[in-house]
A protein has these predicted regions:
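Catalytic cores of nucleic-acid ligases and guanylyltransferases
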Residues: 1-322
């Protein structure tokens, strides 16, 4: 390739923030739940580069074809590869693509095709655009991808803080705020903020794991009822203080079934395959979380409060889709 920017190229990163920044100098975009990917195109040669510099072409052949369908022959894009089903981003389906079997990748590309959503233009033709302010790069990006009406998507953007706030309550993963006058800084956490969408759910406490210290609880395993009235595991909550870990065992005592397990097709489990002990489905907690994969909370949830006013059967799986 003879592009003005060479690979590998580190993407610009964002710092975490709790709320949307205010002021005329900010622009806002929705946060996507996919694989951050830098796209290099020089004629018929397209290369997809992951956030950590690894090649991604073999996992997403349909994205390569989407880039080749763009009129622009020489460019470098920053964006995200995503899989959407019925308007919902499905990170678990996306993750299944990272597999050594080419036949599996080809099948998944047909069944659940991925798409590329562009949110920055880093080079066009012989011109590197890193030094240009974000607002100018954005305008040029709109032209290159035909406002997202072509084969490659264009992330929405607004300078209206109130309008951006909708992305903290809708189907997106949150908001990325960018300084409109800032250049693109590869590998730097500057001029960009990420504000995650924090969701809450009321969950049944279906089991627990013991803590490292005797007589303590390490985590609570959470469940929600599906349409068939089955209690399905959706994740866990931990991070309790030392005093709370000791008090929890007393609170759970009268609900213990003494059924134990460490995984299996129909048992409560986590990636760590730690031993759990079952509980009667009678206790309800409210938790906060920010990511889901399918019907599971992808990262550990945060405990908010006990819900003595809530019946376990009111804790439905549909909460994870709202």
């Amino acid at each position: 390739m003879s592009l003005p920017l060479a690979e590998p190229l580190k993407p610009q990163l964002a710092r975490s923030a709790k709320e949307l920044p205010a002021g005329e100098g900010w622009c806002y975009e929705p946060k996507w739940d996919g694989f951050r990917t830098i796209v290099f195109r020089d004629g018929e040669d397209v290369r997809l580069q992951s956030r950590n510099g690894r090649p991604m072409n073999r996992y997403f052949p349909e994205v390569v074809e989407q880039v080749l369908a763009l009129p622009a022959q020489r460019l470098v894009l920053d964006g995200e590869i995503v899989v959407e089903v019925d308007g919902v981003q499905e990170f678990d389906l996306l993750s299944q693509r990272i597999h050594p079997a080419a036949s599996r990748v080809e099948r998944l590309a047909r069944e659940t095709p991925a798409g590329y959503v562009a949110f920055d233009l880093l080079a066009e033709g012989d011109e590197a655009l890193l030094a240009l302010p974000y607002r100018e790069r954005r305008e040029r990006l709109r032209t290159v991808v035909a406002d997202g009406d072509g084969p490659v998507g264009l992330t929405p953007a607004t300078s209206d803080r109130d309008a951006a706030g909708v992305w903290l309550t809708g189907a997106s993963e949150g908001v990325i705020a960018k300084e409109a006058a800032a250049p693109y800084a590869p590998g730097e956490r500057t001029a960009m903020l990420k504000i995650k969408r924090v969701r809450t759910a009321d969950c049944v406490v279906a089991a627990f794991r013991f803590g490292k210290e005797e007589g303590t609880v390490g985590s609570l395993i959470l469940g929600l009822y599906d349409e068939d009235e089955r209690l399905r595991e959706v994740g866990h909550v931990s991070g309790f203080k030392a005093r709370e870990k000791r008090e929890l065992l007393g609170r759970l005592e009268s609900y213990r079934t003494y059924e134990q397990g460490s995984g299996g097709p129909s048992r409560w489990k986590s990636d760590e395959e730690l031993v759990w002990e079952g509980l009667r489905p009678a206790l309800v907690v409210e938790i906060a979380f920010d990511h889901i994969t399918g019907h599971r909370i992808r990262h550990g949830a945060r405990f908010l409060r006990w819900r003595e006013d809530k019946e376990p059967r009111e804790c439905r799986l549909g909460q994870l889709r709202t």
